[in-house]
């Protein structure tokens, strides 16, 4: 006799027993894919299955399942947006560089190949971020720090990261609410980033830290992946 014990999504089989009319447990053979077989006795049998919730496991050893950014990191890893920094680590508290941010965005966009003459002396052809920078420059998502440099290893501020996201979304500043003024450090938001920050607040991509936006603080890898998750998880 074959029985199938298939749990609902998010659950796993914890225990499965088959007993005869006398309460004797019958031997089950696991055939894989949730199927089990047993020898049917000359009597009725009772089948009992217990299911429990699956234990959530993190894709990276330094990302706790209870961290505010866990779902974002998990989403980004599943989407191929990030593979971490190696050795099973994500580096959530490390500052995110300009190269990393445009690479995350490029991958979120589907890693498009563009025909664009890139003249950035500090972006080596063949580097992991070269095609991402080429795309970002061609789409106006990012600009160089000078006419022929991109500064790929420079740390990105929260304001700069939000500006990249805003440009990629191609939002119109004229449609935005003025929300930045509700934060105590509103005056420290760079002028170029004001439309982007208002957009990010309106879309709940950025929520601030209490009464502060901290626009000039370094944007961590956990933060940029969280911004991306909030902006593009349903796209």
Regions found by a protein language model. Name each.
Residues 3-5, 35-40, 90, 150, ...:
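Generic recognition of long tandem-repeat/solenoid scaffolds
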Residues 1-37:
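Surface-exposed interfaces of beta-sheet-rich extracellular modules
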Residues 3-5, 16, 36-38, 49, ...:
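Extracellular/surface recognition and adhesion modules
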Residues 1-4, 67-80, 89:
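Extracellular/luminal Pro/Thr/Ser-rich low-complexity repeat and linker "mucin-like" segments
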Residues 40-53:
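C-terminal beta-strand-rich structural cap/linker in extracellular carbohydrate-active enzymes
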Residues 26-30, 52-70, 83-131, 139-159, ...:
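Feature responds to low-complexity, polar/acidic, surface-exposed segments characteristic
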């Amino acid at each position: 006799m074959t029985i199938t014990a298939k749990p609902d999504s998010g659950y796993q089989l914890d225990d499965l027993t088959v007993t005869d009319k006398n309460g004797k447990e019958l031997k089950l053979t696991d055939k894989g894919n949730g199927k089990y077989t047993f020898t049917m006795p000359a009597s009725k049998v009772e089948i009992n299955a217990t299911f429990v919730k699956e234990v959530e496991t993190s894709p990276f050893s330094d990302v706790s399942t209870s961290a505010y950014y866990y779902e974002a990191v998990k989403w980004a890893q599943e989407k191929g947006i990030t593979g971490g920094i190696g050795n099973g680590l994500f580096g959530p508290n490390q500052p995110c560089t300009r190269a990393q941010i445009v690479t995350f965005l490029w991958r979120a966009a589907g890693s498009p190949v563009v025909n664009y003459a890139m003249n950035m002396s500090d972006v080596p052809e063949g580097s992991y971020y070269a095609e991402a920078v080429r795309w970002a420059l061609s789409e106006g998502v990012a600009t160089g720090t000078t006419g022929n440099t991109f500064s790929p290893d420079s740390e990105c501020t929260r304001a700069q990261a939000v500006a990249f996201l805003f440009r990629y979304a191609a939002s119109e500043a004229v449609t935005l609410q003025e929300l930045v003024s509700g934060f105590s450090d509103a005056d420290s938001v760079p002028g170029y980033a004001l439309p982007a920050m208002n957009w990010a607040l309106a879309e709940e991509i950025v929520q601030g830290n209490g009464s502060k936006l901290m626009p000039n603080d370094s944007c961590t890898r956990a933060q940029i992946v969280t911004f991306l998750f909030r902006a593009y998880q349903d796209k």
